[in-house]
Amino acid sequence: MAQVTYNGTGRRKNSVARVRLVPGTGKITINNKDVVDYVPFANLILDMKQPLTITETTDSYDILVNVNGGGFSGQAGAIRHGISRALLTVDPDFRPALKSAGMLTRDPRMKERKKPGLKKARKASQFSKR
């Protein structure tokens, strides 16, 4: 018998996360590694689990994630966004709680591009009046 899965795609900065929720015990696997082995910061792990705590489904689903692009912070945001979208396919009644917490909104902030004549996006060389 095929197991029931719920899918969601999340994006943040340059990261894209494809999330699958499978009924289980709350184990999170990212790119075939345990979440503690993959993410070195505890605050990012809590950030990823936020949609689950809001909907009180922390121990109800195993989460399988395939994520690529960006750094740890961007990937954590993409995973959070993907989990939120997957939870909507589980139960559409989660929408008001997730939306009021801002979990369903794609964060549009991106890295600003480097401008010609400047050292970084906004950093210029020191100005000399004379």
Curated annotation (Swiss-Prot):
Keyword Ribosomal protein listed: yes
Keywords linked to the UniProt accession: Ribonucleoprotein, Ribosomal protein
Keyword Transferase attached: no
Leader sequence residues: none
Biased composition (Basic residues): 111-130
Pfam families tied to this protein: Ribosomal_S9
GO cellular component, one term: cytosolic small ribosomal subunit
Gene3D superfamilies: 3.30.230.10
Region: Disordered, residue numbers: 99-130
One GO-annotated biological process of the protein: translation
Gene Ontology terms for molecular function: RNA binding; structural constituent of ribosome
InterPro entries assigned to the protein according to its UniProt record, in alphabetical order: Ribosomal_Su5_D2-typ_SF (IPR020568), Ribosomal_uS9 (IPR000754), Ribosomal_uS9_bac/plastid (IPR023035), Ribosomal_uS9_CS (IPR020574), Ribsml_uS5_D2-typ_fold_subgr (IPR014721)
Domain of life: Bacteria
Residues spanning the membrane: none
SUPFAM superfamilies, per database record: Ribosomal protein S5 domain 2-like (SSF54211)
PROSITE patterns: RIBOSOMAL_S9 (PS00360)
Family per record: Belongs to the universal ribosomal protein uS9 family.
Name of the protein in question: Small ribosomal subunit protein uS9
Organism: Latilactobacillus sakei subsp. sakei (strain 23K) (Lactobacillus sakei subsp. sakei)
Lineage per the UniProt record: Bacteria, Bacillati, Bacillota, Bacilli, Lactobacillales
